[in-house]
Amino acid sequence: MDRYPTIESLINEARARIEVTKAELDEARRRRAGIAAALASEFPGSRHYVNGSVAHGDALTPLTDVDLGVVIPNPEGHYGPGKKGPGELQERAAAAIRRGLADEYGHLRVEFRGRKRSIRVSFRDPIREGLPDFTADVIIAIDFPDGRGLYIPRFDSWDRADPETHTALVTAANRRTESVYARTVRLLKHWNRRNGEVLCSWNIKALALTCVDSKEALVTTMRSWFNHAVQELRKGGTEDPARVTDRPIKLNAPRAEVVKRLEDALAKLDKAIMYDRAGYPTLAQKELADLFNDPDMLEAPPKDAVLRDGVRFHAPQGAPSRAFGAPVIAQTGAGPAAATPAAATPVRSWAP
């Protein structure tokens, strides 16, 4: 396993600050179970599936939503592309949720008309005082008749998808990596939120499925993900990991902009790694703080300490060398990109 003198502990401390609490998870699961019970009563023989951050183990605090799907029997084949759309089933599901939860949540609001995919359940009752409203996104689905996956709503029609396989793939990755996959995704989701949110959460997870596959240091797995994401998105969009649709996962910004943000983030992380291994933890912390762009999660060191270490770094007697561990790193492959003292200036780099 790669060793990092100080930044791995900084990353783990930062991760703990954004990790969802057990109380939040317990309450979210309780509310999700109430919706599932209401839907099971309305649709005998149905099955439900869970997905999203709570199911995948990568939820951030504060937790404000949960996801649930219900697969409704369609033995006569009345529903599907070229047949009935999802509206009738969504209306029944919405009514069942209202009946099942109204006694506990007197201001409950359930909406589906005009929405692309989900029924939105607004509890109007935060799971903790001071938080925004808690919501649930509920997907009604039918089995794909000729193979793997489901049909899920797309406004008044249907799209093929396989959210059950998605959750199975994530669960397997968490088991294989002893939850390093989920911890890495949580950090990347927070980075994404604080830096333009150019990727949806599922794109982050899908990319991680092919590069975060063992128990490694979080700095290593984050670095592997940024490198992999840059390479893949330069070529095109991210494919569906379940391989049931040919459409790539949608980006939230032009692809060139997304790639540029990823390249900049990779450069900051590489500088943090280089400083850390060279014995300049203050400069390494500054690069990590710039990367995440959230002082509540990871605070930048004092400016005078950064300037002092910057002077020491650039002084001839303090310049990194192989003698005390500064890495000589190739530009290609999974390892950190090459960084030289001239490139590693102690100033704010690549401001988001």
Regions inferred by a protein language model and the residue ranges of each:
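Flexible, surface-exposed loop/gating regions in the mature catalytic domains
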Residues: 69, 110-112, 118-123, 150-160, ...
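Terminal (often C-terminal) interaction modules
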Residues: 1-9, 240-352
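Conserved catalytic core of two-metal-ion nucleotidyltransferases
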Residues: 34, 86-147
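Acidic/Ser/Thr-rich, low-complexity mid-to-C-terminal regulatory regions of eukaryotic proteins
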Residues: 135-183
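Hydrophobic, mid-to-C-terminal alpha-helical segments
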Residues: 198-239
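A long, hydrophobic alpha-helical segment
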Residues: 168-214
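N-terminal regions immediately upstream of nucleotidyltransferase
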Residues: 1-50, 55-63, 74-88, 341-342, ...
